[in-house]
Amino acid sequence: MLQSNPVIHPNTSNRHFKFEPFLRQEYNFGLDPDRPVCQFYNPLNPDNSCPQGNNCPNKHVSAMYSNKIVCKHWLRGLCKKGDHCEFLHEYNLRKMPECLFYSKNGYCTQTSECLYLHVDPQSKIPECLNYNQGFCSEGPNCKNRHVRRVLCPLYLYGFCPKGPECEFTHPKFDFHNLNLRIRPDNLIQMTSKHVDNSKEESDKKEDSEPKEESI
């Protein structure tokens, strides 16, 4: 069996540069991009959550990436940004990118094996605000989506303990501001006196007018 020549193929596993810790700490240089996520790291408290800090060998996922979708290049092993990618590098079925083939053609050749998200085209149409409030004058010709829901009886009575997590709908009514002002009490009294005086004057006029005698 031939042995490798140490001159041609030297063993450099025990040789390190002095600036490697700086690159690893500041830029995550030399770390496996598929390493596991740190279970101690809290993105809401990044300074005091993980005891190893920036020297932790596991991945620290920032809070700004919590609502991102999965990187489509990472799914194929072609992402070159590593930890600095603005998309997620993890399998999360709820945050998969949309399947472009399905969105354009209405079907996907990968069927159940497709890793991307199949979004119903009807769900992209915005809901009709007038219909949600009770009535839409355009009816079936409306360009927006009419979603039939069952009204929550508890909400209609005044209060629903489930709030936004209720399985029934909670209608929202827009009340227009009429800019009404309440009159002061003195104006109300003056108005009532004026009405009473005008009524007394009309009664006096009727009494003073001569009445026709019937033959």
From Swiss-Prot:
* Residue runs in coiled coils: none
One term under GO cellular component: cytosol
Single GO biological process annotation from the record: mRNA processing
| Alphabetically ordered keywords of this record | Metal-binding, mRNA processing, Nucleus, Repeat, RNA-binding, Zinc, Zinc-finger
Would I find RNA-binding among this entry's keywords? yes
Q: What organism is this sequence from?
A: Candida albicans (strain SC5314 / ATCC MYA-2876) (Yeast)
Task: Point out which parts of the chain are C3H1-type zinc fingers, as ranges.
Answer: 32-63, 65-92, 93-121, 122-149, 151-173
> Is Electron transport found in the keyword set?
no
Q: GO: which molecular function terms?
A: RNA binding; zinc ion binding
Q: InterPro entries attached here?
A: CPSF4/Yth1 (IPR045348), Znf_CCCH (IPR000571), Znf_CCCH_sf (IPR036855)
Gene3D superfamilies named among the record's database cross-references? Zinc finger, CCCH-type (4.10.1000.10)
Family annotation (Pfam families): zf-CCCH, zf-CCCH_2
UniProt-listed PROSITE patterns: ZF_C3H1
**Region Disordered, residue ranges:** 192-215
Q: What is this protein called?
A: mRNA 3'-end-processing protein YTH1
